[in-house]
Design a protein with these regions (language model features):
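Short beta-alpha junctions and helix-cap segments that line functional grooves
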Residues: 153-155
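G-domain G4 guanine-recognition motif of GTPases
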Residues: 42-43, 67, 93, 145-146, ...
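Catalytic acidic motif of RecA-like/P-loop NTPases
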Residues: 41, 125, 148, 157, ...
Length: 192
């Protein structure tokens, strides 16, 4: 280094603003006494079906609302509205493969969470992008379906390490797939 040149380290996470927004949203929801759950998985793993069954078991005790995130359809929001008593809204991402804290905040505002005990965000079906963005949820849950294979925690470790819980779905077809329930879970800190 010379007197004419100086190096200034300005490294900052590209996620810093989103992380701050997510923490603010988390605190706001906590003050409202609304629990936000972020449900993530690959497309077709059974997120919506699992939500329908879960909501139908919980809705007599909890006020529940659901935000469905998809690139362009409203199929899942319609399914939730038709098969449960939960309020359902659709969030179109316009090609984005995830939701961030600001997008989630827009959904929370539209869902009007002040009267809800539980708000559920069904994130875009993808094992990569949704794991990279903090949505402001109090809990992240991932679904892994048997047909996807038991190697997904090794192939997509971030998804499985940021989640607070994992659901193994479609276990009724386990005999037809090469899926070892005891395989590789410890790699990502998952206790089966």
């Amino acid at each position: 280094m010379t007197d004419k040149m100086k190096i200034i380290e300005v490294k900052q996470s590209v996620f810093a603003d989103n992380d701050a927004d997510a923490e603010k949203l988390r605190k706001e929801l906590k003050s409202e006494k609304t629990f936000l759950l972020n449900l993530m998985s690959a497309p077709g793993s059974g997120k919506t079906t699992t939500l329908v069954q879960t909501i139908n078991r919980l809705e007599k005790d909890l006020k529940i609302g659901v935000m469905e995130a998809d690139i362009d359809s409203d199929v899942d929001a319609y399914t939730i509205a038709e098969k449960t008593n939960a309020k359902s809204i659709q969030l179109h991402t316009g090609g984005m493969c995830h939701l961030d804290a600001d997008m989630t905040r827009q959904g929370v505002k539209e869902l009007d969470t002040k009267d809800l005990d539980l708000a559920i965000l069904e994130n875009v079906g993808n094992l990569v992008c949704p794991a990279e963005f903090d949505t402001g949820a109090s809990m992240n849950v991932c679904i892994l379906s048997v047909p996807e294979g038991d190697d997904k925690p090794l192939k997509y470790p971030l998804m499985f390490t940021i989640c607070d819980a994992m659901i193994i779905n479609k276990i009724d077809v386990c005999d037809y797939f090469d899926f070892d329930m005891d395989n590789k879970w410890d790699v990502c800190g998952i206790i089966a």
